A protein has these predicted regions:
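Signature for the C-terminal beta-barrel architecture of outer-membrane proteins
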Residues: 40-42, 53, 58-76, 86, ...
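Long, intrinsically disordered, low-complexity segments
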Residues: 538, 545-547
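Extended catalytic core of nucleotide-activated donor transferases of GT-like folds
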Residues: 117-118
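Histidine-anchored nucleotide/phosphate-binding helix
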Residues: 81-83
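Well-ordered mid-protein domain cores that form the structural environment of catalytic cofactors
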Residues: 122-169
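Bacterial Sec-dependent N-terminal signal peptides
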Residues: 1-46, 577
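Short N-terminal amphipathic alpha-helices
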Residues: 91-98, 131
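Aromatic-lined carbohydrate-binding surfaces of glycoside hydrolases
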Residues: 99-102, 139
Length: 577
C-alpha cells in the first residue's frame, strides 16, 4: 500500500514538472519562425558541468555530507544548460535547465537539488527600450544598494523573478523600474523587491569632449510579512542611493552614498523586535592613470548594511536572498598560500556577546602600478613592471550598549583592527623565452573579529612567491612556482609549489602541493596535492583534477564560499554553440 502511494506521489510530481516544461515551451515558441534554418540562426546554447567523486582519505577523513545527511553517494554533479533564442529581431527567449544529481557538490545550498528549470525569461529590446519578464539580473550603481548575479563556482544565483523595464531618453537619461522575488533554489523568496534607478549623462547634454560627468539616483524597497505581534518596525524597508561619476582626461573619481531605513536586527535567524536600527554605506573611489603609471584609491564605510529579501536569511553562508553587493575590497591574490587568510566584508550588526560587538566596517585600499622604462638600470632591455597594493579594514568606533542592545557610532572613527594586506609584485622579462614574477605579501588577520572565534589571536603572516615561465617553442611552455608562508605563531608554517606544462595552446598539465609544517591541528603534516590537466578547442573546454582540497574560502571578486576539506576526482566541461 505504501509503495503504491509512493508511486502515485512520484507520478504526480513528474506530471507537474512535465506540465511546467510543456507550458513554458508553448509560451516561448508559439510565435517563433517555422523554418529550421531560421531557428538555427537565432539559437545559442551553453552547457557547463562540474562534477566530483569524493574519496575516503585517512588524512582528510571519510566522505560525509552532513547537510544532506548522506555518506554513500560519493558522486555529485552540478549541470547547467542555457538556451537563448532570438526571434523577430527584437525578442529573446531564454531558459536555463539545472541538474544537481544525486545532490549538489559539497557545501552548496541544499535548495539546489534535483533537476528543474532554474531560470526562464522573455526579453524585448529596441534602440531605446529594454523589457524582461521572468528571471532577470540587474545592478544599480556599484551594487551597494542592489545587485543580482550568478556565480556557479560560488553557488550564487539571486536572480529576480518578475519584470523589469529600462528606457533611454535623449541619449542621456537611463531609467529602470523593476519588481520581483528572489530566486531561492528552484523556488522564490517570501519577501518582494521593487526598485527604480535613474542615470543622467551630463557630458552628453553639454557636449563635453574630455570630461565625463554622470549622476545617478536609486530606490530599492523590500517588503516582507512580519510574524510578530505588535512589531516595532515596518514590513517595508526602504533604501535610497545617490552617486556621482566624474572623469577628466587621465583622472577619474566616483562617490556613492546609500541609506537604509530602520529595520529589525537579525542574529542567528532570530528577528529582534527591540533592536531596531537604520543603516548606511559610503563608497569613494578615485585614481589617475597614464601609460606606464596608475594610482587608484578606494575608501568605504558600511554600517548595518546587511540587506536580504527574507529577514531570517540574513548572513547565510550561501548568499541566498541577498539584495546588495558588499565584497571584500582587498587585492585578489593568485597564489595558493596568499589565499589562506582571506578577508570578508563585515557589513552586519553582531551583538551576540559583550566581548564581540560589531556594527560594520571602515577602511580602504590603495593600488599603485608603475612600469620602469626599457634601457634603464632597473628596467633592462625589456622594462620592469611593478605593482603595489595596501589595504586596511577595521570595525566602526563608537559607544556600544550590550545590555540595552543599542549603539552610536563615530562617522569616521576606526575601531578594532580587522585586517591588513600589503603586497609588492615585480614582473620581469629576461629574454624572449624567459619571464619571472617575484611577489611578497604581509597580512594581518584578526580571526576573533572576522570569524567570531573567541579563543583566537590575530595572525600575522609574510608570504614570498617566485614564479618563472619558459617558452619552449611551437606553443610549448613550462611554468614553475615556489611559495613560502611564515607566521608569528607556531601553527602556520607553509610551503608550496606548482609545476605546469603547456603542450600547446589547447592542452596543459599541472601538479601542485602545499604543506603545513606548523602545529595547526586541522592542517598540520598534510600534503594538499593536486594534479590535472585541461583541453580547449574553440568554445569547448574539458578539465580533470585529482587531489586534496584544504578547508577554507573560495573567493571570486571579493565574495567567498566556504569549502570543506575533501579528497577526490573533479571534472569540468564547458561548451557553447
Amino acid at each position: 500500500m505504501n509503495s503504491m502511494k509512493s508511486l502515485q506521489t512520484t507520478q504526480i510530481n513528474l506530471n507537474t514538472i512535465l506540465l511546467k516544461k510543456i507550458t513554458l515551451f508553448i509560451v516561448f515558441f508559439h510565435f517563433l519562425p517555422t523554418s529550421y534554418g531560421q531557428i538555427i540562426d537565432g539559437l545559442s546554447v551553453g552547457f557547463e558541468s562540474n562534477s566530483a567523486w569524493y574519496n575516503d582519505d585517512k588524512k582528510t577523513g571519510d566522505f560525509t555530507d552532513e547537510a544532506n545527511n548522506d555518506q554513500d553517494k560519493h558522486f555529485r554533479a552540478n549541470n547547467y544548460l542555457k538556451i537563448d533564442y532570438n526571434f523577430l529581431s527584437k525578442f529573446t527567449a531564454s531558459v536555463q535547465i539545472e541538474s544537481y544529481e544525486p545532490f549538489a557538490l559539497i557545501n552548496y545550498s541544499t535548495n539546489f537539488k534535483g533537476t528543474n528549470l532554474g531560470t526562464y525569461s522573455l526579453h524585448y529590446k529596441t534602440s531605446n527600450m529594454d523589457a524582461t519578464i521572468g528571471h532577470f539580473y540587474e545592478q544599480f550603481g556599484s551594487g551597494l544598494i542592489l545587485r543580482n548575479w550568478e556565480d556557479r563556482q560560488l553557488g550564487i544565483n539571486n536572480a529576480l523573478f518578475g519584470g523589469k523595464v529600462s528606457y533611454r531618453l535623449m541619449d542621456a537619461v537611463d531609467l529602470t523600474a523593476l519588481y520581483g522575488n528572489h530566486r531561492v533554489g528552484f523556488e522564490t523568496s517570501d519577501g518582494t523587491i521593487f526598485g527604480f534607478n535613474s542615470e543622467f549623462e551630463l557630458d552628453s547634454v553639454f557636449k563635453w569632449d574630455e570630461t565625463a560627468l554622470n549622476i545617478g539616483f536609486s530606490y530599492v524597497g523590500r517588503e516582507e510579512k512580519i510574524d510578530l505581534e505588535n512589531p516595532n518596525f515596518e514590513p517595508t524597508t526602504n533604501a535610497f542611493s545617490g552617486r556621482v561619476d566624474f572623469s577628466y582626461r587621465n583622472f577619474y573619481s566616483s562617490v556613492e552614498y546609500v541609506t537604509k531605513s530602520e529595520d529589525a536586527i537579525v542574529q542567528v535567524n532570530q528577528v529582534s523586535n527591540d533592536f531596531i536600527k537604520s543603516g548606511n554605506g559610503f563608497l569613494l573611489n578615485t585614481g589617475y592613470s597614464k601609460k606606464g603609471f596608475g594610482l587608484d584609491a578606494t575608501f568605504r564605510r558600511l554600517e548595518n548594511m546587511s540587506f536580504y529579501s527574507d529577514r531570517k536569511k540574513s548572513g547565510n553562508v550561501f548568499f541566498e536572498n541577498i539584495i546588495n553587493y558588499t565584497p571584500g575590497l582587498t587585492k585578489q591574490h593568485d597564489y595558493l598560500l596568499t589565499n589562506i587568510f582571506v578577508y570578508q566584508a563585515q557589513s552586519a550588526v553582531s551583538f551576540l556577546d559583550p566581548g564581540l560587538l560589531k556594527v560594520g566596517e571602515i577602511g580602504g585600499q590603495l593600488d599603485l602600478f608603475y612600469n620602469i622604462k626599457k634601457e634603464t638600470l632597473l628596467g633592462g632591455k625589456y622594462g620592469t613592471k611593478m605593482a603595489f597594493n595596501a589595504s586596511y579594514w577595521a570595525g566602526l568606533k563608537g559607544t556600544f550598549d550590550y545590555a540595552n542592545q543599542d549603539y552610536e557610532t563615530d562617522v569616521f572613527g576606526f575601531g578594532e583592527k580587522y585586517f591588513s594586506d600589503i603586497s609588492l609584485e615585480i614582473r620581469k622579462k629576461w629574454n624572449p623565452k624567459w619571464r619571472s614574477i617575484v611577489y611578497f605579501v604581509n597580512q594581518y588577520y584578526n580571526k576573533k573579529e572576522i570569524e567570531g572565534n573567541f579563543g583566537a589571536k590575530p595572525i600575522v603572516t609574510n608570504i614570498g612567491v617566485v614564479e618563472s615561465t619558459h617558452k619552449l617553442g611551437k606553443g610549448k611552455s613550462i611554468r614553475i612556482e615556489a611559495q613560502r608562508l611564515w607566521s608569528d605563531t607556531q601553527d602556520h608554517d607553509w610551503i608550496g609549489g606548482t609545476f605546469e606544462f603547456n603542450l600547446s595552446s589547447k592542452i596543459s598539465f599541472y601538479i601542485n602541493d602545499i604543506y603545513n609544517n606548523g602545529d595547526d591541528s586541522s592542517t598540520s603534516k598534510t600534503h594538499y596535492y593536486n594534479a590535472g590537466g585541461s583541453y580547449t578547442k574553440g568554445a569547448t573546454r574539458v578539465g580533470l583534477n585529482y587531489g586534496r582540497q584544504r578547508a577554507g574560502l573560495v573567493c571570486i571578486g571579493g565574495v567567498c564560499r566556504f569549502v570543506p576539506e575533501a579528497t577526490g576526482l573533479t571534472a569540468t566541461v564547458t561548451m557553447a554553440f
